[in-house]
């Protein structure tokens, strides 16, 4: 009789912004539980995330989420092999709640502690769809980041292009306020865009520049100026057309840069991840344009339910570090400005 390999169970924490999430992940690719306590209703009246409010909610929810995650997965602390936690980037107060909870569990139950980069977690949300094949390019689009990340192996990240000002998700929320769309605005604007037409032809910043960086501040300004000018002269603008024109500009730039980078960096897979990866307009364009331009590059879209912040993605990224004994200790602290050089040369 052959031996049965032990299953590795990781308890994973995510608290970088406005979701408190704890998950139990088996072998890096199977979700046994993924409990998420969202704070959207608390932040909606402010039109965005208020750090102090976020921290308070994390404190209230973290223990409840831990208990629910273990119960839903039908496991106990004794069954766990490690604890993974987002330690950056994000809101420092919010991060500290998750980091301290994870450190407490790891210490109390003598488990290895795995510090995970939040943005790596977003990429590894796509790992639940299928195994990664390298080299790989990730288009990472979220509220705080817009990046093209090249991976030659698990745990190795090279930023090829990034935003020079506003991230795409940030621009969505800002123009959402102008349109009177409640926070978070991304999903509603996406729906409005599908009902409208690109009639305003907003600028596509940096689309022809010889680099892979992004800029969305000019688009945001053009949008706001268009709306304000209409208000001043008493003109009525179609909000669906405004949304469609804004989204067309964002998607055109993301697509142009992504297809261009794939010419210089041939890859086996392209991963779309991050909160804005839930955008149907962007998903549709990638599904339409990538096969025509790069038929040998496989597109992996992060599952819709895992595009937002969640513990499962942290467990998936953490499992890679677990396999290579990339552990933290009791001195682990939150790093709100953490960048992608978090594991230099892990798999040389």
Curated annotation (Swiss-Prot):
Disulfide bonds: none annotated. It is found in: Cytoplasm. Keywords: Acyltransferase, Cytoplasm, Iron, Metal-binding, Transferase, tRNA processing. One of its GO terms (molecular function) is N(6)-L-threonylcarbamoyladenine synthase activity. It catalyses: L-threonylcarbamoyladenylate + adenosine(37) in tRNA = N(6)-L-threonylcarbamoyladenosine(37) in tRNA + AMP + H(+). GO terms for biological process: tRNA threonylcarbamoyladenosine modification. Its EC number is 2.3.1.234. It is an enzyme of class 2 (transferase). Fe cation binds at residues 118, 122, 309. Pfam families: TsaD. Gene3D superfamilies: 3.30.420.40. Binds 1 Fe(2+) ion per subunit. Its cofactor is Fe(2+). GO terms for cellular component: cytoplasm. It comes from the Bacteria. Substrate binds at residues 140-144, 173, 186, 190, 279. Required for the formation of a threonylcarbamoyl group on adenosine at position 37 (t(6)A37) in tRNAs that read codons beginning with adenine. Is involved in the transfer of the threonylcarbamoyl moiety of threonylcarbamoyl-AMP (TC-AMP) to the N6 group of A37, together with TsaE and TsaB. TsaD likely plays a direct catalytic role in this reaction. Belongs to the KAE1 / TsaD family. This is tRNA N6-adenosine threonylcarbamoyltransferase. The gene is tsaD.
């Amino acid at each position: 009789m052959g031996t049965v390999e032990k299953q590795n169970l990781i308890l994973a924490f995510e608290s970088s912004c406005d979701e408190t999430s704890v998950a139990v992940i088996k072998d890096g690719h199977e979700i046994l539980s993924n409990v998420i306590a969202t704070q959207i209703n608390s932040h909606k009246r402010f039109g965005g995330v208020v750090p102090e409010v976020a921290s308070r909610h994390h404190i209230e929810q973290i223990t409840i989420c831990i208990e629910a995650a273990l119960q839903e997965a039908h496991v106990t602390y004794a069954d766990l092999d490690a604890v993974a936690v987002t330690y950056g980037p994000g809101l420092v107060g919010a991060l500290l709640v998750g980091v301290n909870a994870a450190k407490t569990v790891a210490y109390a139950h003598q488990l290895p502690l795995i510090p995970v980069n939040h943005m790596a977690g977003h990429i590894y949300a796509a790992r639940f769809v299928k195994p990664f094949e390298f080299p790989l390019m990730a288009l990472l689009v979220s509220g705080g980041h817009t990046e093209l990340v090249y991976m030659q192996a698990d745990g190795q990240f090279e930023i090829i292009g990034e935003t020079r000002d506003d991230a795409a998700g940030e621009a969505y929320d800002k123009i959402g306020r102008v349109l009177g769309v409640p926070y978070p605005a991304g999903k509603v604007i996406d729906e409005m865009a599908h009902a409208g037409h690109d009639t305003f032809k907003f600028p596509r910043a940096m689309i022809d520049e010889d680099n892979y960086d992004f800029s969305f501040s000019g688009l945001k300004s053009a949008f706001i100026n268009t709306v304000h000018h209409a208000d001043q002269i008493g003109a009525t603008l179609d909000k669906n057309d405004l949304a469609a024109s804004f989204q067309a500009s964002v998607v055109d730039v993301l697509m142009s840069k992504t297809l261009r980078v794939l010419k210089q960096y041939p890859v086996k897979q392209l991963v779309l991840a991050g909160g804005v990866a839930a955008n149907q307009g962007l998903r549709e364009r990638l599904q339409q344009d990538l096969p025509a331009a790069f038929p040998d590059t496989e597109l992996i879209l992060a599952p819709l339910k895992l595009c937002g912040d969640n513990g499962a993605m942290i467990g998936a990224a953490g499992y890679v570090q677990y396999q290579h004994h990339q552990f933290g200790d009791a001195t682990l602290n939150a790093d709100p400005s953490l960048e992608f050089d978090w594991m230099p040369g892990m798999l040389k």
